[in-house]
Swiss-Prot record:
Basic residues bias spans: 56-65
Side Mitochondrial intermembrane, residues: 1-31
Residues that bear Phosphoserine: 128-129
SMART domains (UniProt xref): TPR
Transmembrane segments: 32-51
TPR repeat windows: 151-183, 184-217, 219-251, 347-380, 415-448, 450-482, 483-516, 524-557, 558-591
Organism per entry: Schizosaccharomyces pombe (strain 972 / ATCC 24843) (Fission yeast)
Biased composition (Basic and acidic residues): 66-97
Subcellular location, record wording: Mitochondrion outer membrane
Membrane disposition: Single-pass membrane protein
Phenotypic effect of disruption: Abnormal mitophagy during nitrogen starvation.
Name of the protein described by the UniProt record: Probable mitochondrial import receptor subunit tom70
Family statement drawn from the similarity comment of this UniProt entry: Belongs to the Tom70 family.
Length: 625
């Protein structure tokens, strides 16, 4: 697999590739497809803020002054206590939104909140020691100016009580301030108190009230988002944090981290549910075919139909040749339960079952079968290679290399071994070592096309452009009917922004696919051409049409599905794009792939909901591609 990318110009190319690790194959392609245009939704979960208007210059009432003096005397009892009090300058600063509490800080504060909650537990919210200064009756007789003046002073007392962690008193002060004036700041500050004692339902009520008065109040959005998350209402939390970020002008990096965390939590929840309800299934036929094509065809073993294991395996091989992979898998599993004419035939059964498990995303399950195959026939190299790929899938590089070394000690003449070892080195960025192994593979069998193609790609990655071009020109002469040669060569030309030549090669690859592959056609030349015309001519309509052709050729091609979603998103067709992202999640092999797909689906869903709920923000959304 090439997966050529150019870090300097930010462009990348998707290739169909043939890689020993199927998961790595999918992950690398998905990474590109999604990065051509991630949905621009960013947000943050806000922390606790204290807001402060300018201190009123008027004279305080005697009764209020007595309570304020009492609060101030507590502040002055000691330097340590004074340090806890929230200063007016800090309150004013927090109003600007610069004191955004990060997700990490929120997590760290969670433990403190539990302690604080214990302290307040004995004293209910209504058990404050605050006298009722502002009541519904008393404020009726006040002028507008008097109510505003009293509200501001009550808020000041609330801020001080909050700073001293006297949350019941702070709630009472803010409640009385609200009695004087329905100011969104008072509701948001009271919500901060409820958050401190863990009453998240009340946080949502107060912040919702604040937002009904001021829909662009960022701190209220942040507080409500945090409360929603605490209650497990992740979709609502994601919406609030997204809107908050847009109002805040995407200025804070923690907002991006927060929305990513929320997206991941939502995606993990949905992935977990889908994995529980979805029965194990094989990936698309083209996916399986691509993997199988990365190995030389093995000669069939000599079957003895007197043994039921042999007979079932013979049928499994017949289905395999026809591309009827589910039937082949079923027969292979049936074969495992039977008797065999020889350990060698039995080894082939385990190898085939392990292969189907591996391409289905069950790397750990496949290891049992591959190990069984090796134990039954230690000279059979293919299960060694596939076992190493399973370890690579599980990020166990130490065991992967041990298996590859064991295979080499058994047989130094197996071309597949060096090809797949080269692939491991290639994806690790060890291009010089990969080139050496590709050359070993070619020296052992120069008829295997993928060793030649990948050699050319590896040479290109080391900036040996002339050598790479020569390798591909030689490939075109030696394998004139191979669509893969023209597809990969087109990718390299596209990476050099030689658009016209790249498209010509993709077109030739498409024609060869139509002519040579009547049953399972590769969609990759069509997808690559779509990317080319988009980069070259910005022709989004043609790019979409090419993706639709790719899906017609291979309806379950995950790369085509993800590409289609992105091109639709680019055109503002978010609802249709969402359908493709969700389909991508349904087709995902592994949980990590599923989480990735659901993350983009949820980002798109949030964008749709946001444009409906906050139409005034549509113009402030970043271009999705």
């Amino acid at each position: 697999m090439s997966g050529i990318s150019n870090a300097e110009n930010g462009k990348a190319i998707v290739s169909s590739g043939v890689l020993n690790s199927v998961s790595a194959f999918v992950r690398r392609h998905r990474t590109f497809v999604y990065t051509i245009g991630a949905v621009a939704v960013f947000a943050t979960v806000g922390g606790v803020y204290h807001v402060q208007q300018k201190k009123a210059s008027h004279k305080r009432s005697k009764k209020l002054k007595a309570h304020q003096d009492k609060a101030e005397s507590k502040v002055n009892e000691g330097k340590n206590e004074a340090a806890k009090v929230v200063k007016e300058e800090d309150l004013k600063s927090s109003e600007t939104g610069k004191d955004v509490e990060t997700a990490a800080a929120a997590a760290a504060a969670a433990k403190k909140k539990k302690k604080n909650k214990k302290k307040v537990k004995a004293k209910k919210v209504g058990d404050s020691s605050v006298d009722k200064i502002a009541t519904e009756e008393s404020v009726k007789s006040m002028t507008k100016e008097e109510r505003a003046k009293l509200a501001a002073e009550l808020k000041t007392l609330g801020n001080k009580a909050y700073g001293q962690k006297e949350y019941a008193n702070a709630i009472d002060y803010y409640t009385q301030a609200i009695t004087c004036s329905h100011d969104p700041i008072f509701f948001s500050n009271r919500a901060a108190c409820y958050a401190a004692i863990g009453d998240f339902e009340q946080v949502i009520k107060d912040t919702s009230e604040a937002l009904s008065l001021d829909s662009s109040y960022v701190k209220a959005l942040n507080r409500r988002s945090a409360a929603y998350e605490q209650l497990g209402k992740l979709d609502e939390a994601l919406m609030d944090s997204t809107v908050s970020c847009i109002f805040d002008g995407f200025a804070n990096e923690s907002m991006t981290a927060t929305v990513e965390r929320l997206l991941k939590k939502v995606a993990e929840k949905k992935s977990s549910a889908l994995l529980k309800e979805r029965p194990p299934k094989l990936p698309a036929a083209s996916f399986i075919q691509t993997y199988l094509d990365s190995f030389h065809a093995q000669p069939k073993p000599l079957f003895d139909n007197k043994f039921d294991g042999d007979a079932a395996l013979a049928e499994a091989y017949e289905y395999l040749e026809k591309g009827e992979y589910q039937l082949s898998y079923d027969k292979a599993k049936e074969s495992c339960l039977g008797s065999f004419s020889s350990p060698s035939v039995n080894a082939r059964t385990h190898n085939l079952v392990g292969t189907f498990k591996f391409v289905s995303g069950d790397s750990k399950g496949s290891m049992e079968n591959f190990n069984a195959a090796i134990k039954l026939d230690r000279k059979f190299i293919q299960p060694y290679i596939r076992l190493s790929a399973a370890y690579l899938d599980e990020n166990d590089n130490e065991k992967m290399w041990k298996v590859l070394n064991d295979a080499e000690s058994v047989d130094k003449t197996d071309s597949d071994l060096y090809y797949h070892r080269a692939q491991v080195r290639f994806v690790s960025g060890e291009f010089a070592e990969a080139i050496s192994d590709y050359q070993k593979s070619i020296a052992l069998d120069d008829s295997f096309i993928y060793s030649h193609i990948q050699l050319g790609v590896a040479q290109y990655k080391t900036h040996a452009i002339a050598e790479s071009m020569k390798t591909f020109e030689d490939c075109k002469k030696r394998f004139p009917n191979s669509s893969e040669v023209y597809n990969y060569f087109g990718e390299i030309l596209l990476d050099q922004q030689k658009f016209d030549d790249a498209v010509k090669n993709f077109d030739h690859a498409i024609e060869l696919e139509k002519r040579e592959h009547l049953t399972i056609m590769s969609a990759m030349p069509l997808i690559n051409k779509a990317l080319a015309v988009f980069q070259w001519k910005k022709d989004i309509s043609q790019a979409e049409n090419l993706c639709r052709q790719a899906l017609s050729a291979d309806p379950e091609c995950d790369i085509a599905i993800a590409s289609m979603a992105q091109f639709l998103l680019q055109q503002g067709k978010a609802r249709e794009a969402l359908e493709y992202f969700e389909k991508s999640a349904q087709l995902a092999r592994t949980e990590s792939e599923m989480v990735n797909a659901f993350s983009y689906a949820e980002a798109t869903r949030t964008q749709i909901a946001l444009t409906e709920k906050y139409p005034q923000l549509v113009g402030r959304l970043s271009n999705p591609m």
